[in-house]
């Protein structure tokens, strides 16, 4: 049975989509069968894997409102062993449309029942908010990866996210685990970067991944070519970091 991992942080610009795309691609390279669900209306995970989002007719929007199955919405992408349920700009409207539905927090969980056994990992790239979209992802997930950038105000909003996770555990999904806190955009030359790493490790100990994602120009270039970092430059620091993260997650889940 596949493990469902949500990549979530309501703070924007922390490396959430970068992590979703490159963790998916790295798991694929390590011969795991992966489904990436783009649950962010910005659709950057979809375009970051070479999918033309303008031409998406069936995607995560239809899966969430149960007008299409995950199988119908799944497309292939530029990364080996990775399939994608892409997003479309109309996903913006889903929160309003779901608000009157019974069991609205369980729409994604219910939809994924049919594909759970077909993949080793199902990753969900969450929107930078704590709305109904993210709530659906956390209710459907077995665990959550929380990217935290090594910059000023890094921990801002983290308490709020952890409280949301606690309330999801209490009300909707008692089995939800924290897979790990992932430090991103680390620059060893900066004192601030090192201070953030120290502070996060001191506060959260074992919850923090050993792998740290370094700031890397290739990582920021890759999405504009519709490629993961592995495809774009397999020798880059970014590729090494995300392969290490994938190995760490596989090892943890053996």
PLM feature spans:
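P-loop NTP-binding core
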Residues: 1-254
